[in-house]
Curated annotation (Swiss-Prot):
It comes from the Eukaryota. It comes from Entamoeba histolytica (strain ATCC 30459 / HM-1:IMSS / ABRM). The lineage of its organism: Eukaryota, Amoebozoa, Evosea, Archamoebae, Mastigamoebida. GO terms for biological process: ribosomal small subunit biogenesis; translation. One of its GO terms (cellular component) is cytosolic small ribosomal subunit. Residues 161-185 are annotated as: Disordered. GO terms for molecular function: rRNA binding; structural constituent of ribosome. Gene3D superfamilies: RNA-binding S4 domain. This is Small ribosomal subunit protein uS4. Keywords: Ribonucleoprotein, Ribosomal protein, RNA-binding, rRNA-binding. The keyword Protease does not apply.
C-alpha cells in the first residue's frame, strides 16, 4: 500500500458562533437562491472571500510604490477580473474588500447554466451538471461549484452524448417505458 499524496488543505471554516439567527436566515436565503447542497458550500465561499480580503488588506497596508504590493495586488485583481468576480472598471484593491458571497456564487457553473436557460430551475441545473450533460468548451464538467472564467462563459453548452441534444440516445425514463412495452408483447 502506498501513501496518499493528496493535498489536504483547508477549504472551509465553520463559524465561531454556531447558532446565530441572522446568519441562519441569510444562509438559508443563499441556499435557496443559488441551489446549494448544504451550508458547507457557503462556508467554502466565505473562506475564499476571507482569503482574498486578507491578501488585499496586507497589500493595502504596504506603501503604494512598494513593488510587492504592485505585483501581488495586480495579480489578485487580474485573477478576480478573469473569473468575473470583479468588474473590469473596478481595478483597485479597495473594491476587493467590498465583495460579497453573492459575487462569487454568481460565477458558479450551476448558476450560469440556469441563467443561460439550459435548465428549468437552479436545482435542475445542478442535476444536469452532476449527470455530465454540460460542457465548458470541449471539457465535460460535473462540478456545480466550478468557477467559470469570463472567456469560458460563452462556451457553456449541452454535451453531445445527452438525451437533450441527441434524440437517438434514450433517457432513463424512455428506456424503462420501451422495456415495459416489450414485455407486454
Amino acid at each position: 500500500m502506498g501513501r496518499c499524496l493528496r493535498n489536504h488543505s483547508i477549504t472551509y471554516k465553520t463559524p465561531k458562533v454556531p447558532y446565530e439567527r441572522e446568519r441562519f436566515d441569510a444562509e438559508l436565503k443563499l441556499v435557496g437562491q443559488f441551489g446549494l447542497k448544504n451550508k458547507k458550500e457557503i462556508q467554502r465561499v466565505h473562506y475564499m472571500l476571507g482569503h482574498m480580503r486578507t491578501i488585499a488588506k496586507v497589500m493595502l497596508m504596504k506603501d503604494a510604490k512598494d513593488p510587492k504590493r504592485l505585483l501581488e495586488g495586480a495579480a489578485l485583481l487580474r485573477r478576480l477580473h478573469n473569473l468575473g468576480i470583479l468588474p473590469r472598471d473596478q481595478n483597485k484593491l479597495e473594491f476587493v474588500l467590498a465583495l460579497k458571497e453573492e459575487n462569487l456564487l454568481e460565477r458558479r457553473l450551476q448558476t450560469l447554466v440556469y441563467r443561460k436557460g439550459f435548465a428549468k430551475s437552479i436545482h435542475h441545473a445542478r442535476v444536469l451538471i452532476r449527470g455530465k450533460m454540460i460542457k465548458v468548451g470541449k471539457q465535460v464538467v460535473d462540478v456545480p461549484s466550478f468557477l467559470v472564467r469570463v472567456e469560458s462563459e460563452p462556451l457553456i453548452q449541452l454535451a453531445d452524448n445527452t438525451p437533450l441534444t441527441n434524440p437517438e440516445i434514450n433517457g432513463r425514463r424512455k428506456r424503462k417505458n420501451n422495456h415495459a412495452g416489450k414485455e407486454d408483447n
